[in-house]
Design a protein with these regions (language model features):
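N-terminal Sec-pathway targeting helices
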Residues: 1-17
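Active-site anion-handling motifs in enzyme catalytic cores
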Residues: 19, 23-371
Length: 371
């Protein structure tokens, strides 16, 4: 009887604790999602989420001396004639998704390098691109795309330029999409998965790599501006123990003082504010000593910025990685489902980036220079 009573007490305690946990998790009224979270490893846990990256970057000077449309008074700018740039409202299949990724705006900044700087481009929403109605525009179609009812084809007012194009869909692509995209062959794809997917449905396609590998055009910093800052993008120690062990073996780096950055942003930010935030991140990455990232959007730009970067992932993504995975220093699970370390280290124990990306970035620059 005594053992039964003890068991009942344990059950009651578990139920009470479960109820308390549910109440804590559901009480989210006072939780604020910052445009991006930046905090230092030495900060206490209670203060980490109170350090706002936007507030910190407002103090940062524009060292490049270049000013873009989103850094000027919008009312004083004229629209660029015939140029569009992609924005992102994360609207899929009739509903707005909860996720956000400032990396999308980094992709748009890469495209913006090939447009005039003294005017503002027309905004075209990636996820409802077939419903764009405005002046005729040229639009670089780089980055991540999921084909659905809102973007099976481009609006008649858009002249799409398909380079660094990635398709998220696993299923067979609709015929209406295939018939439309064939008008603009050959299609430059960001990865081999997208290239092969298009070719298997009769579309001429080639691997062009990612457009963010051209970001040195506007965002490359001088070497004497480089800091000792180590940045973790959407990664922290404890997320992937095998990778942690490798990072701690890099004795040339001090991992006791790390800047953590989250690529999610507050969806309430205007598109101009999102561009501002993306540029400030690039300015920061261009001056870092080392970047550890679980985001392709945070890794590939570093190749162009000449900032040493290690891409970490727990699981090989067969849709996104083929082709671009080989351009990076990587620590994680490879295509054979085995843990692998592929990182370039010099005689001083410092990380340096592979240079294979250059053969593709040079072609992209030449292709888009006279857009």
């Amino acid at each position: 009887m005594l053992s039964i009573k003890i068991k009942n007490v344990y059950i009651i305690i578990i139920i009470i604790l479960s109820v308390i946990l549910i109440l804590i998790l559901t009480n989210t009224e006072n939780i604020k999602i910052f445009p991006s979270i930046l905090f230092n490893k030495n900060e206490s846990d209670n203060n980490q989420n109170n350090f706002n990256i936007q507030k910190d970057f407002n103090k940062t000077e524009n060292k490049s001396g270049k000013f873009f449309f989103f850094e000027k008074n919008q009312n004083e700018l004229n629209y660029c004639e015939n140029y569009g740039i992609m924005i992102y409202d994360y609207y899929y299949d009739g509903k707005i998704m909860e996720g956000s990724n400032i990396g999308d705006y980094i992709q748009s900044l890469a495209a913006l390098q090939f447009f005039p700087k003294n005017c503002k481009p027309y905004f075209v929403d990636r996820d409802i691109i077939q419903f764009y109605h405005g002046p005729n525009v040229k639009l670089i179609m780089n980055g991540w795309h999921r084909i659905h009812e809102g973007n099976k084809f481009t609006s008649q007012e858009i002249t799409p330029i398909y380079v660094s194009y990635h398709i998220r869909n696993e299923e067979k692509l609709p015929l209406s999409f295939i018939n439309n995209i064939k008008k603009y062959e050959p299609i430059g794809t960001r990865d081999l998965y997208t290239r092969d997917k298009l070719k298997n449905q009769g579309v001429k396609a080639y691997f062009s790599s990612c457009l963010t590998t051209t970001l040195d055009i506007d965002y490359l910093a001088k070497e004497n501006e480089r800091t000792n800052e180590i940045i973790f993008i959407d990664y922290k120690f404890g997320d992937f123990i095998p990778a942690d062990k490798y990072l701690y073996s890099l004795k040339a780096y001090n991992f006791n003082n790390i800047t953590y950055i989250n690529h999610q942003f507050d969806i309430k930010l205007t598109h101009v504010e999102r561009f501002q935030l993306a540029k400030k991140l690039l300015d920061k990455y261009a001056r870092a000593k080392l970047i550890i990232s679980t985001r392709l959007h945070g890794s590939l730009p570093c190749l162009a910025l000449n900032t040493p970067v290690i891409y970490i992932d727990k699981e090989y993504n067969y849709r996104r990685y083929p082709g671009i995975y080989e351009l990076l220093n990587t620590v994680g699970i490879n295509s054979k489902r085995k843990f692998e370390i592929r990182v370039n280290i010099d005689k001083k124990g410092l990380v340096y980036n592979p240079k294979k990306y250059l053969e593709y970035s040079k072609i992209l620059k030449k292709q888009l220079r006279n857009i």
